[in-house]
Amino acid sequence: MSGIGRTRSITLAGLRGEVVHVEADIAQSLPGFTLLGLPDQALQESRDRIRSAARNAGLPLTRRHLTVNLLPAGVHKRGACHDLAIVLAAYAADGRVRNVEGPVFLAELGLDGALHLSLIHI
C-alpha cells in the first residue's frame, strides 16, 4: 500500500537552520525519480546516489515513479545531507517503514549504502 511518506531534514537559510519537510509519493507510472523544491546540483545528484545506495544495501527503491518534494519550496536546499531523509520518505511512501515523520535525518549515503557524516554548507 502506498501513500505519502514524510520525513524531515535541515538546511541553512542565511545563518540559521531551517527544517526541511521531505515528502515522497509513488505513482503507478513509468520508473523515474523527480526531485522538487529548489535543490542545488549536489542534491540533484542524490537521485542516482540514493538509488545505487538503496540497491547495494539490499533495499532497492520502488521501480515505479518516485516524486520527492522538499518544503518550503522557496528556500534553496544545499548538499547531500538530505539523502537519508529522502530515502526514508521513499520507503515510508512504499509502506516499508513507519514512524519516521518526527525525527530529523541528516546524513549522506555512500554508493554502498553506508551513512556518512554530512556537514551543512553555507
Predicted feature residues:
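Peripheral, non-AAA+ core regions of ATP-driven protein-machinery
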Residues: 1-121
